[in-house]
């Protein structure tokens, strides 16, 4: 049986992309020093979760995969330390915008997965920013095994995990940005974990999720229609095999 060491990182995200990339770099190096070979980062970790509000100005965050700062940075880190790192980023492909992950294997970008399931409610307004993915589910044959990656809301749908398992995935990873549910007034964390434990048990494959942490607030202005809101991202990143 193949033995692989996996690290799931969680941290709060500031307004400065360079700060968030540097923080993720430091944590990834610390994990690698402890033997981690696969590093999982949270969803859209370059910035605060901008999908909490609607602003056209945020569209400029989207870049082609080989122009994204985080992808380029972690491509070099993965090459230096011989790591596998799926990097979540806001992707521009022509006139289309996607919530994507670039799978990096020791410096090589093996390909991109684009988020299939796009949430849309009062505080997770992703359909304003992202087109549903057109890649289909993907599994990559990396130096540390066959790895499939879903993105956040993908994890709620059993088809995501099952499709990747049927494609031969030995490990399923979910970069995530999930927190409080002000409209429902409930704690979704236990349900979130149990759902993915079910995916692991049903497909007989380890599953990991990396989530951000911290309170992120939106303040009213003309462009967001006077919205005032906040989300408390609860972290609770985990690795499970059942």
Q: Which sequence ranges carry the predicted segments?
A:
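CN hydrolase (nitrilase-like) catalytic-core segments centered on the catalytic cysteine
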Residues: 66-84, 152-242
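Short beta-strand scaffold segments in enzyme catalytic cores
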Residues: 87-89, 100-103, 138, 237-239
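Beta-strand-turn-beta hairpins that frame and shape the catalytic cleft
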Residues: 1-6, 139-148, 171
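A short, polar/charged loop-to-alpha-helix boundary motif
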Residues: 115-129
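A charged helix-plus-loop insertion that forms the helical arch/lid used to bind
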Residues: 54-67
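Short, glycine-anchored, charge-dense loop/turn motifs used at functional sites
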Residues: 6, 103-110, 231, 235-242
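Residue-level detector of high-confidence beta-strand sites
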Residues: 112-114, 174
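Active-site beta-strand/loop signature of hydrolases that rely on acidic residues for catalysis
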Residues: 6, 20, 28-57, 78, ...
């Amino acid at each position: 049986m193949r033995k692989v060491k996996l690290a799931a990182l969680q941290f709060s995200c500031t307004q400065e992309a360079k700060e968030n990339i540097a923080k993720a770099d430091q944590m990834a190096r610390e994990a690698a020093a402890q033997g981690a070979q696969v590093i999982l980062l949270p969803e859209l970790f370059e910035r605060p979760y901008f999908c909490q509000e609607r602003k056209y100005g945020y569209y400029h965050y989207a870049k082609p995969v080989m122009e994204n700062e985080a992808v380029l940075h972690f491509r070099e880190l993965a090459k230096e330390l011989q790591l596998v790192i799926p990097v979540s980023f806001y992707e521009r492909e022509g006139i289309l915008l996607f919530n994507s992950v670039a799978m990096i294997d020791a410096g090589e970008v093996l390909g991109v997965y684009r988020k299939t399931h796009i949430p849309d409610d009062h505080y997770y307004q992703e359909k304003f920013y992202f087109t549903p993915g057109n890649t289909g589910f993907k599994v990559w044959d990396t130096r540390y095994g066959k790895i499939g990656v879903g993105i956040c809301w993908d994890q709620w749908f059993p088809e995501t995990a099952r499709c990747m398992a049927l494609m031969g995935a030995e490990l399923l990873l979910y970069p995530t940005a999930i927190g409080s549910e002000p409209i429902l007034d409930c704690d979704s964390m236990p349900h979130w974990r149990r759902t993915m434990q079910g995916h692991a048990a049903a497909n007989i494959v380890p599953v990991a999720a990396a989530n951000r942490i911290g309170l992120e607030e939106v303040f009213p202005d003309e462009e967001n229609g006077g919205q005032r809101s906040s989300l408390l991202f609860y972290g609770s990143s985990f690795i499970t095999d059942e």
